[in-house]
């Protein structure tokens, strides 16, 4: 089985691209969805211990937690030390299940793939991109998003140009869904011929 790492900066259309891979029959691991899942369960006690007052009714309140860690690198590292081992366990289970199902390709949708060294654990990287103007408009349309929050989020991510340069495949979401579907078909055809590369 070949593993594709799907990544892209916030607002590039990565979630839509992941959904289109899933529609094409490819198993997709969604790191963000897994974070939401563990915040509602297994991570909540450890997060509350490390960041008192950030859980409500036994679940992590993401807005409260974000306010505590967004501008504090040490706090972010403490949070990542709690969450990343749990994410790795879920990720490994997903890959085992995908392999067992006989899927020729699986996609792991990880926002900070390059930033966390995840590109070494996949066979190829797909970077999702769009124009800077479209990206900002998409993000600022989200509830609760501000220019300050957006700039803080982007500061933690590699620039889009660098991600595109390092990518094996680039998917441009600027022109609607049909071009993205066509790009996905091309990627899946190319992936079938690729040697396994991951460590």
From Swiss-Prot:
The keyword Ubl conjugation does not apply. GO terms for cellular component: cytoplasm. It comes from the Bacteria. It is found in: Cytoplasm. Its main location: cytoplasm. InterPro entries: Depp_CoAkinase (IPR001977), P-loop_NTPase (IPR027417). GO terms for molecular function: ATP binding; dephospho-CoA kinase activity. It catalyses: 3'-dephospho-CoA + ATP = ADP + CoA + H(+). Keywords: ATP-binding, Coenzyme A biosynthesis, Cytoplasm, Kinase, Nucleotide-binding, Transferase. Residues 3-199 form the DPCK domain. This is Dephospho-CoA kinase. It comes from Rhodopseudomonas palustris (strain BisB18).
């Amino acid at each position: 089985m070949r593993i594709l790492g799907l990544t892209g900066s916030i607002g590039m259309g990565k979630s839509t691209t992941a959904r289109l891979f899933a529609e094409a029959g490819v198993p997709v691991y969604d790191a963000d969805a897994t974070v939401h899942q563990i915040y509602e369960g297994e991570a909540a006690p450890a997060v509350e211990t490390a960041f008192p007052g950030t859980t409500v009714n036994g679940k992590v309140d993401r807005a409260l937690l974000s306010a505590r860690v967004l501008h504090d690198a040490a706090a972010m590292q403490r949070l990542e030390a709690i969450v990343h081992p749990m994410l790795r366990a879920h990720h490994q289970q997903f890959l085992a299940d995908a392999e067992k199902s006989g899927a020729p390709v699986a996609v792991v949708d990880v926002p900070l793939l390059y930033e966390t060294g995840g590109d070494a654990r996949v066979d190829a990287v797909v970077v999702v991109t769009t124009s800077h103007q479209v990206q900002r408009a998409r993000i600022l349309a989200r509830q609760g998003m501000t220019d300050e929050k957006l700039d803080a989020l982007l500061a933690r991510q590699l620039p889009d140009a660098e991600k595109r340069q390092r990518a094996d495949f680039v998917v441009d979401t600027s022109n609607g869904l049909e071009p993205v579907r066509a790009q996905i078909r091309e990627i899946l055809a190319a992936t079938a011929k690729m040697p396994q590369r991951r460590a």
